Amino acid sequence: MAKRGKKYLEALKLIDKEKTYSLDEAIQKLKEVEKILQRKFDETVELIFRLGVDPKYADQMVRGSVVLPHGLGRELKVLVIASGEKLKEAEEAGADYAGGEEIINKIANENWIDFDIVIATPDMMPKLAKLGKILGPRGLMPNPKVGTVTTDVKRAVTEAKKGRVEFKVDKTGNLHVPVGKISFEDHKLKENILAVVDAVLKAKPPGAKGQYIRNVVLKTTMSPSVKLNPAELQKALETKAA
């Protein structure tokens, strides 16, 4: 195990590992930890779920996307693969790159991946198949389940630019979702987090048995984890919706 620095150990004392915190308390704890750690970069805040699913079964796969109300805190580069009028639509919506087979060949031949999200029209998907080994492992392959295979290119690009994030449970039942930057105001982080919780709840698969959300923690890139109370999160969602 890597040796922890003095600042990290000092920050660790702020968090009670046996306690589950309310969302407001957890955000405050992370802000206090950040003051101690004094990182030289604006750390990403991440929500990590432990789900009661076994994703090796198709009816227990958890996958989806959500538009964060306040974005991720960084500009995402969007690539659209389409043809004809859809290319013009993509450019007008603000896509960073837009093209057809020439873009596909560039990725295949040059291993070019200077983008964060790939959106494709359905007619281009057969041609994209050869990019599976390049885009797949990086989570960049377009998928209709998360809205990146669509004929509504304008909407997809607009949502991506606003801060749409995709999520997919890993083989161990864990789900990692970025929710913003530590520099965000508390209420913005909270609203982003609740949007993610809502999306994950709505993505509950039909084969899930027993407790769906078993554990949730909030952390930054380099900080210790802060445990959240799943029941309190759902209550906060209900309060927001009321």
UniProtKB/Swiss-Prot annotation:
SUPFAM superfamilies named in the record: Ribosomal protein L1
GO CC annotation terms, alphabetical: large ribosomal subunit
Alphabetized GO MF terms: rRNA binding; structural constituent of ribosome; tRNA binding
Alphabetized Gene3D superfamilies for the sequence: 3.30.190.20, 3.40.50.790
GO biological process: regulation of translation; translation
PANTHER family: 54S RIBOSOMAL PROTEIN L1, MITOCHONDRIAL (PTHR36427), LARGE RIBOSOMAL SUBUNIT PROTEIN UL1M (PTHR36427:SF3)
Name used for this protein in its record: Large ribosomal subunit protein uL1
Organism: Sulfurihydrogenibium sp. (strain YO3AOP1)
Gene: rplA
